[in-house]
UniProtKB/Swiss-Prot annotation:
The gene is Ccdc88a. One of its GO terms (cellular component) is membrane. InterPro entries: CH_dom, CH_dom_sf, HOOK_N. Bifunctional modulator of guanine nucleotide-binding proteins (G proteins). Acts as a non-receptor guanine nucleotide exchange factor which binds to and activates guanine nucleotide-binding protein G(i) alpha subunits. Also acts as a guanine nucleotide dissociation inhibitor for guanine nucleotide-binding protein G(s) subunit alpha GNAS. Essential for cell migration. Interacts in complex with G(i) alpha subunits with the EGFR receptor, retaining EGFR at the cell membrane following ligand stimulation and promoting EGFR signaling which triggers cell migration. The modification Phosphoserine is found at residues 233, 237, 449, 1020, 1387, 1417, 1677, 1692, 1719, 1822, 1839. It is found in: Cell membrane; Cytoplasm, Cytosol; Cytoplasmic vesicle; Cell projection, Lamellipodium. This is Girdin. Residues 1715-1825 are annotated as: SH2-like. Residues 1839-1852 have a biased composition (Low complexity). It comes from Mus musculus. Disruption phenotype: CCDC88A knockout mice display mesial-temporal lobe epilepsy and early demise, and structural brain developmental defects affecting the corpus callosum and cerebrum. The keyword Membrane applies. Phosphorylation is induced by epidermal growth factor (EGF) in a phosphoinositide 3-kinase (PI3K)-dependent manner. Phosphorylation by AKT1/PKB is necessary for the delocalization from the cell membrane and for cell migration. Phosphorylated on tyrosine residues which promotes binding to phosphatidylinositol 3-kinase (PI3K) regulatory subunit PIK3R1/p85a and enhances PI3K activity. Tyrosine-phosphorylated by both receptor and non-receptor tyrosine kinases in vitro. Tyrosine phosphorylation is required for AKT1-dependent phosphorylation of Ser-1417.
Length: 1873
């Protein structure tokens, strides 16, 4: 079955054009292979790879498997190599991207015998065709394609267009390199790019989905067992199962992960508990060992005490010594404290020194910065002045431009007036000329003269240009208004908002940091106070326990170290918290930056849409069609207008910049005022500082007073240290014990201790003095730093006050942030308290970890879903699904939806009514336009402006309506998106709150468990002194639990409120979605209505066209128009009101959208802050863990110490019993001691006061130090910001300088363009002057034609005699030519380039000699007969004028059109006016034709030069060959100039030149570059000969030999001005030929029309036919006297057939021989035959040319060269030639032909040029039938010099021939007289 289906497909495929094209590369299958074999060969890829190698031989050859044997893998390998090569070739060499889907190799490899396989092979072949057509060998492949059938050719051409031109298949990347592309070209490219992007994205999504499905299938194969078919449910699809299983697996995975985490947490907790238990066990064991040892020691001590009671006295003496040692120890301790103070002081001094150095460097940097700023200020002032001057100059230039425009308008008016006058004059002249030419019998209708036509053309051009100028001025004004309103405002607002937001963020960051640092400082101060109190208590305990002093000292040192560690840890915590907050702030900044970027992107999108709308409006506006003749000029004017528009835009930009600078200056002034206010506030601060200084001085005075009091109380200060220690350190009981002990000791020791304490007080006083001095110094430093900070704060406050404008928007956000921060701070405090007391808070943290990770995963998923939702919102598919689900859930919202639907229905009706109104307005406007057109064709110009204004208003209304609709839709879409986002965020937030609730509940449960455990422990442990403490802790825990409960209740309330908000948002979302759907339905309905209304509009337009014919009266139309205008005005007002209401609605929606965006941003910030706080809490939790462990260790140590102290307490109680007995003894001494104690109390009070003041001073110094550090950090941050701002300022300055440079460049360009415009206007004036001179020449030529009437018959007889002489000379010339051929070496046609170049060099040398001798022989020209005086006499001045007319033709290509039109008019004059029937009329026509032919002669010669110049220009590769070709071209033209200068051959020469110019049209088409380069290159080389050519022609028209010589010299003098003039004629002739060839009627038909009008012409033509028939019998021998026209044509046909048969290997000699034999056949005949011969030869060449082009591409230029050969051959029949010189000329032409044929740059000619040349041969017979009677004798201007061998013979022959000619001409003149 498959074979039966595939065989017809295979036959169709193998007969397809692509396969037939591929077969041109070679046979697909060996031998007579079937279609299947050929198809298999194609599919295997071996043959196609070979084809690709032929196309791209440079490609890297990869190994292709030639023996596939139906192996799919090998086939795929081969085809993949092919596809890679094709792709590489397109991308690298052709610079194109393949946009069509590449051929599927898998389908071709695995299933080639199918429809899909054939289609993929077709794609492959298509891509191969594209490569072949665009490769280097494309000419060969195109020739092969042209050899195919016509149908296949057409199909292949269509395929080529698909590959090359269709941008959907292949995208061209070369436009990227093009810099200057118009917007019209860029728009389709952008549209294509967008469509391609969409397609690529769709394909990418499809492929990604398929990849996911495949991977899932693979995973299912790996993991799932092969399920039986019964297990599968019949209803459920496998795709649904996959998705369900996937979801199920993901849920299970998440649960498993959560379980793993929980298990890990439990494991870690249990390990920690294990470790704690181990530590406790070890501690218990250590304590047991210690207690055992103490017990043993106590037992041994008891025994020893009993033994050593007698040694107590000795021990008491030792105790006395110990007391002394302790006193010494205390002194040393105090000194140790002093050492530590000194160390701290040294470090402080070092830090102060470093700070001073840093401040010094910073001040120096600031100095440099201020200097740079001052310099920059000067520069900015200068630049400001310069800009003002520039602005003034620009205003002056604008005024000047306006004046110039007004002057130009006035000049245009004057030119129009002058043009009208010239038109009237030309009409008058034409009328006079026609009256002269007319006879009295027939007076036909007058025809338009040349001047009239020129004037009409110029007037039409001027009118069109005026219209365009008006339209351009309107567009310029519109652009100004739009650019001023839109561009400036949007750009300024964006920049200001960005800068304000950035600076606001910085200010907020700095403020937050300052607040945080202040808080940390306060915490540190509180901690330091607590530590000081603890230190005091510890010192008291040390002094009470002097016996265990050594142990206590060690313990205190350890405690001090531990406290230092705690302080450092607290500081680290504060720093870490500060850093975390900084990071949070940075994250918030990043989020804000991203939101700003998003808003900027949205704004750019809106601007882009605006631009697109503007472009569409412009495209709709540009409906006018421009004329083909004026396209070039209009484009030029368009460019000028664009340049002017650029200038205008640049000026606008500069004006806007100036405005912005002025605004900035005003803002800076305002800021300066604000800064002055801030300076006043800082001055107040300085006053406060001064007050502080005064307080310090007062403190100094108090210290001095204290010193005096200390000196007065020296005697009583001996006992001060004991009481001080007792008052500070001990409780009441300990103080009494201490007093007893000290009373027991000697009073002498007390005095010593008092002395020691006195010394300590002295040292403390000195220290206080030093501290005060340091504080004074620091205050001075701080003052200096404050001044610096004030300066910097001024700079910072400038930026702050700039940001205050933008900070108003962010105040709401700040308030919310502060509230959130307060909440977070409360939460942090609660968490810290919980973490200090509870170990089980780890679970909470870890649960939070899991929840956070899950939330992050969910957030990532939700973000992805958001992106997909944003993409799919345009399609509204998911929104519909959501709507259905939400409708099921919420049926209550149906009522609200119905209300909304009603409102939407009303809105829809309003919209429909508005649309109907607008359509009515359109219909009315169209009616108005039709009626206005019908009213009067004469009043079109008057009403044109009104119509244009109405159209513009109508378009504006339409555009406004469309824009409002689009904007409303966009706003609603954005609202929906924002609400959806807000909903999602609220859901996320609710989930987070739920998770937090769960965690709090878990914590609550854990706390309850712990409380229960603690209660159990308390009940089990026996009651001791610690019970009170545990009770307190449990009470605190219960309080905290109550707090947590309150917090939970608050959180639940918040949750409930958030859920309510969520429900409200859901309802809002549903409403908006319903509105959106309704709006979509409305839009679709409106679109349908617009389509139907457009159709109705078209029908109405047709009806209007019919009704316009019926409308007759103007009065009824005017009344209807007035009524309609009134209606339109009413409608317009209503539309404007509606538009205002719509705009208000749009603004409300915008405000709503902004509020939603703000809410969204707030929620994002909250989420990120919570995440960051969570991270910081985790880190803090870790640190708290470590701290908790340390505290446990310390707690154990303290417990040990406590036990020791209890033991000591027991010992002390024993001692107290002993002391009580001793106290009774000491009561007497105590009475004496009380007096001392009272004094001591006074001193203690004073000492306490001093200590208090000292502590206050210390606190103040610490506060100042912290403030100083804070200020330092602020200073550093501000300096960093300052450096960054300076860098930004430098960047902006550089950008400003670059913009300045660009503006100056653009100004220079504008000036240059204005100069060019002036030059062009001058050239236009010059061309008008030239046209006037041509008109004058036309008059003179017509007058000369009238004078030449009488000489016609005389010259006819002279020509007959001349022909007889030429017949005799023919045989002599043939013999001489044959003699020359003996010495001539045959040259190969090609492949012997070196031999040709050698011959060329020889010929160039000989040519120089020929030129020298030729100049000598110019003086030997014989005189003409007296009867030919005044015939065709052109004055010398006129010839110069004609040359000057064309002098500027190549300088400005724009004037060619006018030139062409004028020359066409000149050429058609004789044919338009040849209508008289009598002989007199016939003669007049002949005179006109002769005069016009003489006028055209100069242009014909210029065309010859043009061909040479183009040929020379087309060979740019080699300089030497180019020079040789130029010289050869000059030689060829010199021969034509010499040999065709006679009056006899003037007509023939004209015909030949015309044919030659027709041949050159093909080269003009091929190489258009030659036009511009001809004046610079080709004309210089040929400067000498064309001038002599023209002068020779003028000399033949004169009677005297002297006159001819005089004019030759004049032509030679005017070499520099003339060469460029010849090129101008070429275009006029070409234009004429192209018009004739393009028209349907041939020139022969035209001639027939002319002959119908004139019977004389019919009679003449019949006579010529009879004479040809009569002369057929005599055409056998070459010596026969008369040759008929038919015989000559047959001979020319034979010559063409011979040239067609000649191959590329023929010698050039044979061709020259054949052409010379033909020329010898017609030289002896009469004049008309010679003319036709020249025509037939020149007309033959295109055919030959075409034939040679098909065989070899190297011989593409044979056509024009053979025309030159024809010139030289026809000139061989003149009476006075030297034959050897003629043969040399033949050699030169042949060599030049070879050199030109070898040009590799030649390309194919156009078909139009070939056809026109073929028609040109038949067209000119009509002119030369009139010239058959011309019998004027020829005059030889130049005789070519002889060679070295036969110079004397040739000179004698020349002289004899000239003498015989002169004598014959004189005898005939006598006879005629």
């Amino acid at each position: 079955m498959e074979n039966e289906i595939f065989t017809p497909l295979l036959e169709q495929f193998m007969t397809s054009p692509l396969v037939t094209w591929v077969k041109t590369f070679g046979p697909l299958a060996a031998g007579n292979g079937t279609n299947l074999d050929e198809y298999v060969a194609l599919v295997d890829g071996v043959f196609l790879n070979q084809v690709m190698l032929q196309i791209n031989p440079k490609s890297e050859s990869q190994r292709v498997n030639k023996k596939v044997n139906n192996d799919a893998s090998l086939r795929i390998h081969n085809l993949s190599i092919l596809v890679k090569q094709i792709k590489f070739y397109y991308q690298e060499t052709l610079q194109q991207l393949i946009m069509m889907p590449l051929p599927d190799i898998l389908i071709i490899g695995k299933n080639p015998f199918s429809e899909q396989g054939t289609e993929e092979v077709k794609k492959l072949l298509l891509l191969l065709l594209g490569c072949a057509v665009q490769c280097q060998k494309k000419e060969e492949f195109i020739e092969k394609i042209q050899g195919l059938d016509f149908d296949t050719k057409a199909a292949v051409a269509a395929h080529i267009q698909e590959v090359t031109h269709n941008q959907e298949n292949v995208f061209d990347l070369q436009w990227m390199e093009v810099t200057d592309m118009s917007q019209e070209d860029i728009e389709p490219l952008l549209k294509n790019m967008v469509s391609h992007l969409r397609r690529l994205i769709d394909e990418r999504d499809e492929h990604s989905e398929t990849i996911v499905e495949l991977s899932e299938e693979r995973d299912g194969v790996h993991f799932l067992p092969h399920a039986s078919s019964s297990a599968q449910s019949p209803c459920g699809s496998p795709g649904m199962k996959r998705t369900e299983s996937r979801q199920h697996l993901s849920v299970e995975l998440a649960d498993a992960k959560a379980k793993i985490r929980r298990l890990r947490q439990e494991l870690e907790e249990k390990t920690e508990q294990l470790l704690d238990c181990k530590q406790e066990l070890e501690q218990i064991e250590v304590e047991l060992k210690r207690l055992q040892q103490e017990n043993m020691n106590l037992l041994s001590d008891a025994r020893s005490a009993r033994m050593y009671r007698d040694e107590l006295d000795a021990l008491r003496e030792k105790a006395v010594r110990v007391d002394k040692l302790e006193s010494e120890l205390s002194r040393y301790k105090e000194r140790l404290h002093d050492i530590e103070f000194y160390k701290a002081r040294v470090e402080e001094l070092k830090e102060d020194n470093q700070v001073l150095l840093e401040t010094k460097t910073m001040l120096e940097d600031q100095l440099e910065g201020t200097r740079a700023r001052s310099d920059k200020l000067h520069e900015l002032e200068k630049e400001n002045l310069q800009l003002k001057a520039k602005l003034h100059d620009m205003e002056m230039e604008r005024d000047m431009d306006r004046k110039k425009i007004e002057e130009l308008m006035e000049e245009n008016m004057t030119l129009e007036m002058a043009q009208k006058q010239s038109m009237d004059e030309s009409l008058h002249l034409g009328w006079e000329l026609e009256q002269i030419s007319r006879t009295s019998e027939l007076a036909e209708a007058p025809q338009k003269s040349l001047g009239h036509e020129v004037n009409e053309l110029t007037s039409s051009k001027l009118l069109k240009l005026e219209m365009e100028n008006q339209s351009l001025t309107k567009t310029v004004e519109e652009l100004r208004s739009t650019a001023d309103s839109a561009a400036g405002s949007t750009s300024k607002i964006l920049k200001v908002e960005k800068e304000n937001q950035r600076l606001n963020k910085k200010v907020e960051i700095l403020e937050n940091e300052i607040i945080q640092e202040k808080q940390s400082l306060q915490n540190c101060q509180n901690l330091s106070k607590d530590l000081m109190k603890e230190k005091a208590q510890l010192e008291k305990t040390i002094e009470t326990l002097r016996e265990n002093s050594e142990r206590q000292i060690k313990i205190l040192e350890q405690e001090n170290e531990h406290l230092n560690q705690t302080v450092s840890s607290l500081r680290q915590r504060s720093q870490i918290s500060a850093e975390a907050r900084v990071k949070d702030i940075e994250k918030e900044n990043k989020i804000l930056h991203e939101s700003i970027k998003e808003t900027c992107g949205k704004l750019s999108k809106i601007e882009f849409e605006k631009r697109q709308m503007k472009k569409e409006l412009e495209l709709y506006k540009e409906k006018g069609e421009r004329a083909e003749e004026l396209e070039n000029e209009l484009n030029h004017l368009g460019k000028e207008n664009e340049l002017l528009q650029k200038k205008i835009t640049n000026l606008k930009i500069t004006c806007e910049k100036l405005e912005t600078l002025e605004q900035e200056n005003s803002e800076l002034e305002r800021e300066n005022r604000k800064f002055k206010k801030t300076l006043d506030s800082f001055k107040n601060l300085t006053f406060q500082l001064e007050s502080l200084e005064k307080e310090n001085s007062q403190l100094d005075e108090e210290n001095l007073e204290l010193r005096r009091s200390v000196e007065s109380l020296k005697c009583a200060s001996m006992r001060m240290a004991q009481l001080q220690l007792e008052n500070k350190e001990l409780e009441s009981e300990k103080e009494q014990l201490r007093k007893g002990l000290e009373l027991m000791r000697a009073s002498f020791k007390k005095t010593e201790r008092l002395e020691v304490s006195y010394q300590g007080l002295d040292t403390e006083n000195q220290r206080l003095q030093k501290a005060l001095e340091n504080s004074n110094k620091k205050i001075q430093q701080l003052e200096s730093e404050l001044q610096d900070l004030e300066m910097e704060n001024q700079t910072l406050q400038k930026s702050l006050e700039e940001l205050k404008i933008s900070s108003k928007r962010l105040e709401q956000l700040e308030k919310e942030n502060k509230s959130l921060e307060q909440e977070t701070s409360q939460l942090e405090k609660d968490k810290k308290q919980l973490e200090k007391e509870n170990k089980r808070l780890r679970q909470q943290a870890e649960i939070k970890d899991t929840t956070l990770e899950e939330n992050n995963v969910k957030i990532g998923n939700l973000e992805k879903e958001n992106k997909t939702l944003f993409k799919e919102i345009n399609v509204y598919k998911e929104s519909c699904v959501r709507l259905k689900e939400l409708e099921k859930e919420n049926k209550e919202l149906v009522k609200r939806a119905t209300i909304d639907i009603k409102t939407l229905v009303t809105l829809r009706e309003d919209l429909v009514s508005e649309k109907l109104k607008t359509q009515q307005m359109n219909n009315d406007l169209e009616k108005l336009t039709h009626e206005l057109e019908k009213i009067g064709l004469n009043k079109e110009r008057l009403l044109h402006d009104e119509q244009s204004t109405d159209d513009s208003r109508y378009k504006l209304l339409e555009s406004k309506l469309e824009s409002t609709l689009k904007k409303s839709l966009e706003i609603k879409e954005e609202k929906i998106a924002a609400l959806e986002a807000r909903l999602e965020e609220s859901t996320n937030y609710n989930q987070q709150l739920r998770h937090e609730l769960k965690t709090v509940k878990k914590n609550y449960e854990a706390l309850k468990q712990r409380q229960d455990e603690e209660r159990m422990v308390q009940s089990s442990i026996p009651v001791s002194g610690e019970d009170d403490k545990w009770g307190r802790e449990s009470q605190e825990a219960t309080r905290e639990l109550l707090k947590v409960k309150d917090r939970l209740i608050e959180v639940e309330r918040n949750n409930a409120t958030l859920q309510a908000e969520k429900q409200a948002l859901k309802t809002q979302l549903k409403q908006l979605e319903t509105q959106n759907n309704n709006l979509q339905a409305q839009i679709l309905a409106l679109q349908r209505q617009t389509v139907s209304l457009q159709e109705q509009n078209t029908t109405l337009q047709t009806q209007n066209a019919k009704l316009q014919v019926e409308n007759s009266t103007l009065n009824s139309q005017s009344t209807s128009l007035m009524n309609q205008n009134a209606q339109l005005l009413i409608q317009q007002s209503s539309l404007e009101n509606e538009n205002e209401s719509i705009m208000k609605e749009r603004e409300d929606l915008k405000s709503l959208y902004d509020a939603l965006i703000k809410d969204h941003e707030k929620l994002e910030l909250l989420h990120e802050r919570q995440a960051s706080e969570y991270e910081s809490l985790i880190s803090k939790h870790g640190t708290l863990k470590s701290a908790h462990k340390n505290l446990e260790v310390e707690h154990k140590d303290l417990e040990d110490r406590y036990n020791q102290l209890l033991k000591q307490k027991g010992q002390l109680e024993d001692l107290e019993k002993m002391i009580k007995t001793e106290q009774e003894k000491m009561l007497l001494e105590s009475k004496n001691h009380e007096v001392v104690a009272s004094e001591y109390k006074k001193l203690c009070g004073e000492n306490d006061r001093l200590n208090y003041t000292y502590s206050q001073l210390l606190k103040e110094t610490e506060i100042l130090q912290m403030d100083h550090k804070n200020l330092k950090s602020v200073l550093n941050n501000s300096k960093l910001e300052q450096t960054r701002l300076e860098a930004e300022f430098s960047k902006l300055k550089e950008q400003y300088q670059q913009l300045d440079i660009t503006s100056t460049k653009l100004n220079n360009q504008c000036e240059l363009l204005s100069q060019l415009k002036g030059n062009l206007e001058e050239e236009n004036r010059h061309l008008l002057d030239q046209i006037q001179t041509l008109m004058l020449q036309n008059r003179t030529l017509l007058e000369q034609n009238m004078e030449s009437k009488d000489l016609f018959h005389v010259e006819q007889r002279q020509y007959i005699d001349k022909l007889n002489e030429l017949r005799r000379q023919k045989e002599k010339l043939e013999e001489k030519i044959m003699d020359q051929y003996k010495f001539y070496d045959p040259s190969p046609p090609r492949r012997r380039g070196n031999w040709i170049t050698l011959k060329m060099r020889k010929l160039i040398k000989s040519k120089k000699d020929i030129n020298r001798e030729r100049q000598k022989s110019l003086t030997l020209t014989p005189t003409r007969s007296d009867s030919s005086e005044g015939f065709l006499q052109l004055p010398h001045q006129d010839s110069q004028d004609s040359s000057s007319v064309g002098s500027n033709s190549l300088e400005d290509g724009q004037t060619l059109g006018t030139k062409k039109s004028s020359m066409v008019a000149l050429k058609r004059l004789p044919f338009l006016r040849n209508r008289p029937k009598d002989k007199d009329k016939m003669k007049a026509c002949y005179r006109r034709s002769m005069s016009m032919n003489d006028l055209v002669q100069s242009m014909v010669l210029a065309g010859g030069q043009w061909t040479g110049s183009t040929e020379n220009l087309e060979v740019p590769d080699d300089i030497s060959t180019g020079k040789r070709r130029k010289e050869l071209g000059a030689m060829a033209f010199s021969t034509t100039a010499i040999n065709f200068s006679t009056v006899n051959s003037s007509a023939a020469f004209r015909s030949k030149q015309l044919v030659n110019n027709k041949d050159t049209t093909s080269f003009e088409d091929i190489s258009p570059q030659g036009i511009s380069d001809d004046s610079s290159t080709g004309s210089r080389v040929h400067a000498s000969r064309p001038a002599s050519l023209d002068s020779g022609r003028t000399s033949t028209s004169n009677s005297n030999n002297n006159a001819s010589l005089h004019e030759v010299k004049a032509g030679a003098v005017n070499i520099q001005s003339r060469p460029q003039s010849h090129s101008s004629g070429d275009f006029s002739l070409l234009h004429d030929h192209e018009t004739w060839s393009s028209s349907g009627s041939s020139p022969i038909q035209y001639l027939k029309r002319q002959t119908r009008s004139s019977p004389m012409l019919q009679h003449k033509i019949s006579e010529t036919i009879e004479s040809r028939a009569h002369h057929k019998m005599k055409a056998g021998s070459p010596g026969s006297e008369v040759v008929t026209l038919q015989q000559f044509l047959e001979e020319s046909n034979k010559l063409t057939s011979i040239q067609l048969k000649s191959s590329s290997q023929e010698n050039l000699l044979d061709e020259v021989m054949k052409s010379l034999s033909v020329s010898s056949d017609f030289l002896g005949k009469d004049k008309p035959v010679s003319c036709t011969l020249a025509r037939s030869v020149s007309g033959k060449t295109p055919g030959d040319f075409y034939d040679r082009r098909t065989t070899k591409p190297e011989f593409l230029r044979t056509g024009p060269q053979k025309t030159e050969d024809a010139y030289t051959i026809s000139s061989a029949g003149k009476p006075t030639p030297s034959t050897q010189g003629k043969i040399k000329l033949v050699k030169e032409t042949s060599v030049s032909r070879q050199s030109k044929d070898s040009n590799p740059y030649a390309t194919l000619p156009r078909a139009s040029s070939v056809i026109s040349t073929a028609e040109g041969t038949t067209r000119r017979t009509s002119i030369h039938d009139f010239l058959s009677k011309d019998s004027r004798l020829p005059v030889s201007v130049d005789s070519s010099p002889p060679t070295a061998g036969s110079s004397s013979t040739t000179a004698s022959n020349v002289n004899k021939v000239q003498e015989s000619r002169n004598s014959k001409s004189r005898s005939r003149e006598q006879q005629s007289s």
